[in-house]
Amino acid sequence: VVHTVTSPESGLHAAGEDAIRLARELVRRDSTNHGGGQGDERAAAEYAAEALGEAGLDPLVLESAPRRANVVVRVPGTDPSASALLVHGHLDVVAADAADWTLPPFAGEIADCPVTGVPALWGRGTVDMKNTVAMVAAVVRHWSRHGLRPRRDLVLAFVADEEDSAAYGADWLAREHADLFEGCSVGIGEGGGETVHARGTDGRPVRLYPVGAAERGSAWLTLRARGTAGHGSRPPRDNAVGALADAVARVGRHAWPSHLTPVTLDAIDAVAKALGVERSPGDTATDEAVDALVARLGEAAPLIAPAVRNSATPTMLSAGYKVNVVPGEATAGVDGRVLPGAEAAFESTMDALTGGRVDWEYAHRSPAVSAPVDGAAFAAIGAALRAHDPDAHVVPMCLSGGTDAKVFSRLGIDCYGFSPMSQPEGLDYSALLHGVDERVPLDGLRFGVRVLDTFLRS
């Protein structure tokens, strides 16, 4: 007999402890992605597959290249007419230098957080994003123990290479194994669902839960200037280094105009309403007015600020091989981020900023994506959060960076950033992303398990 009622709280408590154990073991399996194809997710993938196998599932471990492993499994639902839901997360992590950490980054130790005093799991990947992989696995293991099933099919995809190009992970799966995602219309992954503490205009505490509903596109650019090579004592008029330096300086100084997408406008409205910030028709009339409005959102301003305009950040320079030799070519790398609908404006602006002496081209490009915030999926996310935090204010968000949602969106899947995690006040959770002493509160994992259980069976 399949029971579809809410599982006993005692069972979910055990699932929360299971998530903590699974997360510790995943952290202990070093899956550092060094970039450029240098990574090894195999041990983490095998452990995740073993955990899912213990729930009666038959996961596939798929290698796109030696040791670049991905795990995919379908969890059958009770309603074959319902579209499937994709739940994606990545197994790779960024590098960590143990000398900089208070506790070893791959030991999976539990210790109190020095900021909040609450017990936390420390280690690389506890925030990004082995925590979510562990929570999802714990939920389906809980279902197996209690005879529970979701209403719709779930496709779980724990992938490689998100921290670099996705070439060995989501991108490879979407190209070579698209059939595994058949029937998926909605997906959830990283990029939202964590508590953001703020204060209303009257001083009352407000708990916001931003949910990713859009992502700026990635536009990694190579700028190239060419000139006459020669001796440093006889400088040419067309010095490539000087031309490139001028262009890079213009790019770095440029004040990009505001470009408010529907998701960002919805986010501003939702945050302002939650905080009691009054709005007026002129709030978005000019760039200055937009910036002033965002500033009035106080602690919530960082949720909105990166999503109101395009950006282009110079990050790399390369020229020459010897100080007394004028190089014939100089290059720069620029990290561009482009809002939905602002691609043409971005390109024309880069043309103007680089000028006639410097060419630019895309080194890597992934378009911006967005998903509906007025449909059943976003409503179900909000309902699940409010079921376990009645005072939750769920707000849409446009992510400043990017996730594997960009890849899975190509398959026609509406993707949301939803990795639920309660956070104590005073902890800057987002600052721990890729940071030293990355850690997640144990109660945050327990909360996430409860919310995911509700959402994934809704």
At which residue positions do the language-model features occur?
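Short, conserved micro-motifs enriched in small and acidic residues
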Residues: 119-134, 163, 238, 439-446
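Metal-dependent amide/peptide-bond hydrolase catalytic core
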Residues: 2-6, 193-214, 218-447, 453, ...
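N-terminal helical capping/dimerization or prosegment-like subdomains
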Residues: 2-98, 329, 333, 343-347
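A glycine-rich helix N-cap at a beta->alpha junction
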Residues: 175-193
